[in-house]
């Protein structure tokens, strides 16, 4: 776990506030579109959709939920589940979520570990917040699908992605190597986890939102997130959080990594543009340090390439 800016233990005057927190464990945030693979896999596990399902997003990129409107940046037409993730369609994700019964959807999110301590034992760990389904209106269920209305830590998000990486098995988070067998719980069917992981590879393609998260020679599965932050008058268009959560190698997962940027400056603030390249750099070095064999010759996109399709 790495936090920047960090602190210098020899310079006490500069060691204040946020510099002293392990943000990956203590801080929580709305995860945005990084929740979409969790939504898709939950719906598949509940039998609401399957790998061949098609989702209609044809109403001019708009979905009315009561008096509220959910929007996509453009009209994507009919999408398969991989397309919902590749284009990062809010309308598609919300449409899927609204097909699930609230209690069943909540139980799936709970089983992934949202709203619960990971049990890592780090001082000050936050359990985040997952509202109980009994308080959901339809719009709350819809926005949970694309990561608004709950709060998570980076460690919780990594643990949830580790379920997809581990073919549907949830294992406890630990900072210590143990020779004892770890408790484990099956959350997703083996085939569902593999199908979703394959769908997530499309996000890192040139047609997805994160081609800059690609790593030469390795298959990568992941999801971007670009989250509007809350200001004094509600969500603002001036302050963002950029995220990328990913798994590598997607063919035989060994590592999960979550990168989070608070309020990137300038006009470049999308998760695929800001967090994606950092993921590729850190994960690429980690794969080399662990001597993990490449999948094949998968070239990295040119550095000037920007996200195509959706941008969330």
What are these regions (language model features)?
Residues 1-33, 38-263, 271, 303-312:
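Beta-lactam-recognizing serine transpeptidase/beta-lactamase-like catalytic domain environment
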Residues 165, 204, 280-287, 291:
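Short amphipathic alpha-helical signal-transduction/dimerization elements
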Residues 264, 269-285:
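Amphipathic oligomerization regions
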Residues 287-312:
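Gram-negative outer-membrane assembly/targeting C-terminal domains
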């Amino acid at each position: 776990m790495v936090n920047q800016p960090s602190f210098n233990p020899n310079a006490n005057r500069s060691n204040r506030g946020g510099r002293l927190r392990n943000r990956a464990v203590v801080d929580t945030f709305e995860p945005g579109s990084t929740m979409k693979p969790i939504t898709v896999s939950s719906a598949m596990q509940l039998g609401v959709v399957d790998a061949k399902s098609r989702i209609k997003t044809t109403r001019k990129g708009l979905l009315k939920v009561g008096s509220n409107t959910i929007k996509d940046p453009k009209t994507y037409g009919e999408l398969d589940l991989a397309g919902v993730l590749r284009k990062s369609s809010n309308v598609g994700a919300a449409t899927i979520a609204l097909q699930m019964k609230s209690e069943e959807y909540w139980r799936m999110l709970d089983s992934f570990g949202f709203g619960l301590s990971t049990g890592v034992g780090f001082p000050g760990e936050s359990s985040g917040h997952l509202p109980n389904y009994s308080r959901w209106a339809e719009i709350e269920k819809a926005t949970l699908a694309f990561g608004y209305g709950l709060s998570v830590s980076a460690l919780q998000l990594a643990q949830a992605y580790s379920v997809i990486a581990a073919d549907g098995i949830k294992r406890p988070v630990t900072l210590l190597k143990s020779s004892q067998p770890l408790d484990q719980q099956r959350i997703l069917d083996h085939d569902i986890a593999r199908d979703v992981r394959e769908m997530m590879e499309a996000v890192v393609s040139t047609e997805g939102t994160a081609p800059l998260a690609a790593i030469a020679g390795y298959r990568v599965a992941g999801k971007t997130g670009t989250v509007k932050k809350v200001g004094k008058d509600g969500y603002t268009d001036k302050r963002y959080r950029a995220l990328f959560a990913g798994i590598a190698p997607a063919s035989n997962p060994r590592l999960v990594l979550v990168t989070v940027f608070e309020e990137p400056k300038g006009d470049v603030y999308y998760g695929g543009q800001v967090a994606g390249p950092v993921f590729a750099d850190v994960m690429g070095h980690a794969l080399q340090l662990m001597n993990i064999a490449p999948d094949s010759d998968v070239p990295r996109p040119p550095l000037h390439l920007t996200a195509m399709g959706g941008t969330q």
